[in-house]
Curated annotation (Swiss-Prot):
GO-annotated molecular function: DNA-binding transcription factor activity; DNA-binding transcription factor activity, RNA polymerase II-specific; RNA polymerase II cis-regulatory region sequence-specific DNA binding; transcription cis-regulatory region binding; zinc ion binding
GO cellular component, one term: cytosol
Species lineage: Eukaryota, Fungi, Dikarya, Ascomycota, Taphrinomycotina
Origin superkingdom: Eukaryota
GO BP terms, alphabetized: positive regulation of transcription by RNA polymerase II
Presence of the UniProt keyword Chaperone in the record: no
Annotated protein name in UniProt: Uncharacterized transcriptional regulatory protein C965.10
């Protein structure tokens, strides 16, 4: 699908000239074309902005044919593509973009017909407005650097990837709300979006798309503000971190077990150079959203179970406790408090392993901390803002079922890695039955992209032949409907543990199996 087809109205009640002023076109109003100040702008007291002569839309026949075909083959990239959105806001002119207080329709909010075997297509974002991020308030679009195929990949990311990372229905998602405005004037973010779009749209099996994706990854890294400046400003820091987080997400989405960790380590080192994790509190909405993403991927990484999280959970909690974050949905949203508790369990695991259980006082200390964590799990409820928004008011709502699933999974994880309960223990079996019932409710839901970690814990605790057969069927069901994410690698790990624990009567640490494979597995996607 060509990039302009999303922006052209399907029906036109009355003709509008392509040569009207940009202000009228941005509001989709007919312009009387009186120079130098049209009547509408004169009445509104606005400065009239006109397109430069010679920049009008060209090649009408070519555009009409592309729109009728509804797609352009990846081999037929148009290197001389000239970006122009007729009868709407001219994104190539920064002066035509709205200032704070005005709003435009986000391009990603319009209907789209994008078919792909790699992502589900049943959910698309509802109409939203571009947010105002103080650090990035003066966009200067770079879309003209891309041809139509590259723009379509960027759009695909926003249309088809952003919706499946949304947990609360209708909640604005951070991916388009943060990354798209950045991409309009930051090359590194724009190139990262294109690189991700190529892989997510065409998959890893398309060698040409994969090659082009790698080209744009290299471009993104070369244009990172971090690479160009020794003393980063806060806005440059946010842009660089956004680029790293986007690359991390994309690699994890394709079950990568090496590259994502490299990008993540680069992000960690950059944060430290800026003064540590708490610096993100000073970076307005953008920094706080990225802080949540960083913590989420840190906690759900296999190596954190061996070394501990990069930053303390108290640091993560400190940044999380900001009301502004309720404006947009991050990756974990309503399961956020449970993700933080999983982080507490992981760090307690590392502490217990380092000191051992030979010392009674230390053993009692670990036990008391585990009891405190268990109390947190029992008292944990969906965030107040989520409940107040009436999005979790139904007992059968998918977000609430996901919260219950993660709550049960967190309880199982505490007993597995701290109390060392084997799968065949009565308590673990009761929790497993409760967990699998919740998984079955979400297998074919729009939230199935959030099941990698619960599926891992369910697989580890499947002790009988019937339980393992049912688990395999659930994996097959998920893989048929959702082909990105780390689930296939989770399945490999689970099968290896079944070989080592045929009767389910011992407790085996999954992260040590992952380390034996030489992997760094992340269950965040």
């Amino acid at each position: 699908m060509t990039s302009t087809s999303h922006f052209v109205a399907s029906t036109v009640k009355k003709p509008r000239s392509r040569y009207g002023c940009l202000i009228c076109r941005s509001m989709r109003k007919k312009c009387d074309e009186v120079h130098p100040q049209c009547g509408r702008c004169l009445k509104a007291g606005k400065q009239c902005i006109w397109k430069q002569p010679g920049t009008e839309r060209k090649n009408k026949t070519k555009w009409r044919k592309a729109m009728q075909n509804n797609s352009i083959p990846i081999q037929d990239l148009a290197d001389d593509f000239e970006l122009d959105f007729p009868d709407t806001l001219d994104l190539t002119n920064p002066d035509a973009l709205p200032v704070l207080g005005e709003s435009i329709v986000n391009p990603i909010s319009l209907p789209v017909d994008v078919a792909s075997p790699f992502l589900p297509s049943e959910c698309y974002p509802s109409k939203v407005e571009l947010p105002y991020f103080p650090l990035l308030s003066k966009p200067n679009t770079l879309l003209s650097l891309l041809n139509d195929e590259e723009i379509s990949c960027c759009e695909y990311y926003c249309y088809s990837v952003a919706p499946i990372t949304t947990i609360l229905p209708g909640q604005p998602n951070f991916l388009p709300q943060l990354l798209l405005p950045m991409a309009l004037h930051e090359e590194s973010v724009l190139y990262s979006l294109v690189a991700s779009g190529y892989r997510l749209k065409y998959g890893n099996d398309n060698s040409l798309a994969l090659q082009k994706s790698k080209v744009f990854v290299n471009r993104a890294l070369l244009t990172l503000p971090e690479r160009r400046s020794l003393n980063l400003s806060k806005s440059e820091f946010v842009v660089s971190l956004a680029c790293y987080i986007l690359l991390v997400y994309t690699e994890i989405a394709f079950a990568d077990t090496t590259e994502w960790a490299t990008y993540f380590l680069n992000a960690y080192n950059m944060i430290n150079k800026m003064g540590g994790f708490k610096i993100l509190k000073e970076c307005s909405s953008e920094g706080k959203l990225l802080a949540e993403c960083f913590a989420y991927f840190d906690i759900l990484a296999s190596q954190s179970n061996l070394n501990g999280t990069y930053y303390s959970i108290s640091d993560y909690t400190d940044v999380y406790g900001v009301d502004e974050l309720q404006l947009f949905e991050s990756l974990e949203n309503c399961i956020k408090p449970l993700v933080l508790i999983i982080g507490d369990i992981i760090n307690l695991l590392v502490e217990s392993r380092r000191a051992g259980f030979d010392d009674l006082q230390h053993t009692l200390n670990i036990y008391e901390k585990s009891q405190t964590i268990e109390g947190k799990i029992w008292s944990c409820v969906p965030q107040y803002e989520d409940m107040k928004s009436n999005k979790l008011d139904s007992e059968k709502s998918e977000p609430l079922q996901l919260f219950k699933l993660y709550k049960t999974t967190t309880e199982m994880y505490l007993r597995q890695v701290i109390s060392r309960m084997p799968p065949v223990s009565l308590e673990m079996q009761v929790l497993l039955h409760k967990q699998t019932q919740l998984i079955d409710l979400l297998l074919e839901s729009s939230l199935r992209n959030s099941l990698s970690f619960p599926m891992l814990i369910a697989g580890l605790n499947a002790a009988t032949d019937l339980q393992r057969t049912n688990f395999k069927n659930r994996v097959n069901c998920l893989c048929q409907n959702y082909t990105i994410g780390s689930l296939k690698k989770v399945w490999i790990v689970v099968q290896e543990i079944w070989k080592m624990n045929q009767n389910g009567n011992i407790c085996i640490d999954w992260y040590e199996v992952v380390q034996k494979f030489g992997w760094r597995l992340n269950t965040g996607v």
